[in-house]
């Protein structure tokens, strides 16, 4: 997929030095976001120091419904460049309700290896996960979690034990509570 002219223009607008113009651009993205623009938003989130822009970007990322953005989120979460906004990016994953089931190992690694706040957000993604996951993957991840339990802090042990309780029961279809 190549980047279209409109997306190039939006990405360019996100690099403006005018905060109001950036906020207007973010509002326009709600109607026409694609994976290239999501990557630009993640860059903006990482680079800006302006709270109102961070809030606007996070609101948009947490409302995304474009499944093409899932690999963009995963790539950013795994990139050390974005370590400073990793917690927020992981939170957006459970908030936007997109399907991350094929990335179960990524989120389990986050629970195991990251500081508690990121680990908690990753746990929440797994808790809200749905879709078919191969038994071999689940079995491999359970072994990883059990290994991590041997030298986990009390807080991490709580999350890891929680994973052991839920990972076998990830539903194949999204469940809606009334």
What are these regions, as identified by a protein language model?
Residues 1-13, 32-46, 66-79, 98-112, ...:
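Amphipathic alpha-helical scaffolding segments comprising HEAT/armadillo-like alpha-solenoid repeats
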Residues 15, 147-150, 154, 168, ...:
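Generic surface-pattern signal
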Residues 15, 49, 63-66, 81-87:
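Short linear motifs at secondary-structure transitions and domain/linker junctions
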Residues 17-18, 49-50, 81-82, 114-115, ...:
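Short inter-helical turns and helix N-cap capping residues of alpha-solenoid HEAT/ARM repeat scaffolds
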Residues 106-158:
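A generic hydrophobic-segment detector
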């Amino acid at each position: 997929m190549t980047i279209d002219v409109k997306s190039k223009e939006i990405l360019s607008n996100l690099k403006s030095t005018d905060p109001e113009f950036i906020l207007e651009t973010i509002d326009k993205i709600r109607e026409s976001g694609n994976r290239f623009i999501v990557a630009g938003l993640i860059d903006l989130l990482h680079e800006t120091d302006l709270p109102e822009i961070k809030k606007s970007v996070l609101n948009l990322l947490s409302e995304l419904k474009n499944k093409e953005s899932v690999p963009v989120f995963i790539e950013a979460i795994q990139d050390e460049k974005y370590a400073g906004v990793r917690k927020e990016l992981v939170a957006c994953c459970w908030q936007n309700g997109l399907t991350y089931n094929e990335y179960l190992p990524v989120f389990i690694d986050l629970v195991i290896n990251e500081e508690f706040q990121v680990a908690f957000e990753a746990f929440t993604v797994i808790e809200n996960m749905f879709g078919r996951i191969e038994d071999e993957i689940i079995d491999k991840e359970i072994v990883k979690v059990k290994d991590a339990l041997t030298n986990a802090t009390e807080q991490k042990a709580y999350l890891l034990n929680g994973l052991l309780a839920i990972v076998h029961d990830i539903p194949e279809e999204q469940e809606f509570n009334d």
